[in-house]
A protein has these predicted regions:
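Aromatic-residue detector
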Residues: 2, 42-43, 73
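Cleavable N-terminal signal peptides of Sec/SRP-targeted secreted and luminal proteins
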Residues: 2-16
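Extracellular/luminal segments of secreted precursors and ectodomains of membrane proteins
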Residues: 47-48, 52-114
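Secreted, propeptide-processed cysteine-rich mini-domains
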Residues: 12-59
Length: 114
């Protein structure tokens, strides 16, 4: 009985960490934190059936019925931004593998609206 009560209490917090749009913010030495459209677009391609990159907001958005989990999105921004590296996406949707990029620090942002 107690476990069920605890689950009912925690469930809203778990559900609150889902979003319809996310982006990556990055920092490099000598600069400020910026919204990184290249990294965001690159990560957005990881889920092609469930997401699309919005050129106007520079955010990755979900298609109807899909959600982002904020923690997983942020992990991907950090992993690809600072460790594995990422590539810019061309306007035709292909990846330009001629220049692998990394940044000094990265984080994810998933605003509730926008």
């Amino acid at each position: 009985m107690r476990a069920f009560s605890l689950l009912a209490l925690l469930l809203p917090f778990v559900a609150a960490n889902t979003h319809q749009q996310c982006d990556c913010w990055t920092w490099s030495a000598g600069g400020d934190w910026i919204q990184n459209a290249d990294l965001t677009h690159y990560i957005c391609l990881q889920w092609p059936i469930h997401t699309y990159f919005d050129d106007k907001s520079n955010r990755c958005k979900t298609v109807k019925g899909s959600v982002f989990y904020g923690g997983l999105w942020e992990e991907n921004c950090i992993e690809y931004g600072t460790k594995q590296g990422y590539y810019p996406v061309r306007t035709d949707g292909t990846i330009d593998t001629s220049k692998k990029m990394t940044v000094g620090a990265a984080t994810g942002s998933c605003p509730n609206r926008g």
